[in-house]
Amino acid sequence: MLYNLLLPYIHNSHIANLFHYITFRSGLAVLVTLSLSFLIGPRLIKFLQTLQKYGQPIRLDGPESHQAKAGTPTMGGIMIILSSCFSTLLLADLTNKYIWITLFGFVSFGIIGFLDDYAKVTKNNHYGVKGKSKLLLQGIISLIVCILLEYTIDSPSHMLNVPFFKSLSMDLGYLYIFFAIFVIVGASNAVNLTDGLDGLATVPIALTAGSFALISYLVGNLIYSNYLQLTYLPNTGELTIFCASIVGSCLGFLWFNAQPAEVFMGDTGSLSLGGVLGIISVITKHEIVLGIVGGLFVIETISVIMQVYYFKATKGKRIFKMAPLHHHFEKSGWTESKVVIRFWIISLIFVLIGLSSLKLR
């Protein structure tokens, strides 16, 4: 909004000219979302405590230490969604189609998560919306996003770029739409599975969003994309501001979500954040890189898949003491804080590997 309002004065005012730079608006986006999170956080938490009689339902078969979390309110993802959307609408170019498509997906996945959280807190169990129903809704939203990208963006690409290789890419044709849906839905659920401990998912999400802030900026810049031999995608640079907003809102949320958590992001936060990271990876044509920088989410998801299939195949035996993987380490005697910090370190390593693919090819 501010960019569009100040656009006529960019060449006449030094202050207005600052808003011409994506880097300036991105840095400002982090500060705005961080400040807004600090401002609305305490009020939102108090409201959620009043609204939710029992708070987030705690699994009885989980680690014993988790029973102390009973009564902690969920739906804290509302804070992330509100602050991120406000900052993006305030600082991004509102004529940019990518911004609106991304915001649509972000809010839509957040609504799915909200419905799931609402079902959990009203029924006082951890089941929520049925898995198949939730998956169907995610698929529909992802399909709508893909259709919007297909028919509202000039020259949509169906190419799948392979990182670490200069010219290795595959034209998937219209099969790319199904691949994109898989990426978006998969990312949404992967982040959701990872969000099981205080602060565990928040930092990896911020790191991944920060990575895609850089990627969006590079592929949206003709000079940098040519230098790094990346596919140039005009107008994607504005997504840098949205990604920066996610970073700021996650850091602000972490203030209240650090152990012992005052609030959980719930599916409202995890489904929306995972889904929008998937959407941005599709727009920037770095879907595989998302699987690398978000490697922690992939590992957590694989651990669940392995556990389920092995349990069914062996009629009751388990590979892990409990899935997702972070619960296995808790059951093995690691403290919650040790699991969280070590998983943050692992996430940072994956991010560095993923970002190295931008240059090493």
UniProtKB/Swiss-Prot annotation:
CDD domains in alphabetical order: GT_MraY
Reactions it catalyzes: UDP-N-acetyl-alpha-D-muramoyl-L-alanyl-gamma-D-glutamyl-meso-2,6-diaminopimeloyl-D-alanyl-D-alanine + di-trans,octa-cis-undecaprenyl phosphate = di-trans,octa-cis-undecaprenyl diphospho-N-acetyl-alpha-D-muramoyl-L-alanyl-D-glutamyl-meso-2,6-diaminopimeloyl-D-alanyl-D-alanine + UMP
EC number: 2.7.8.13
Ranges that cross the membrane: 28-48, 74-94, 99-119, 135-155, 167-187, 203-223, 236-256, 263-283, 288-308, 338-358
GO molecular function, one term: phospho-N-acetylmuramoyl-pentapeptide-transferase activity
Disulfide bonds: none
PROSITE patterns, A to Z: MRAY_1 (PS01347), MRAY_2 (PS01348)
Protein name: Phospho-N-acetylmuramoyl-pentapeptide-transferase
Organism: Rickettsia bellii (strain RML369-C)
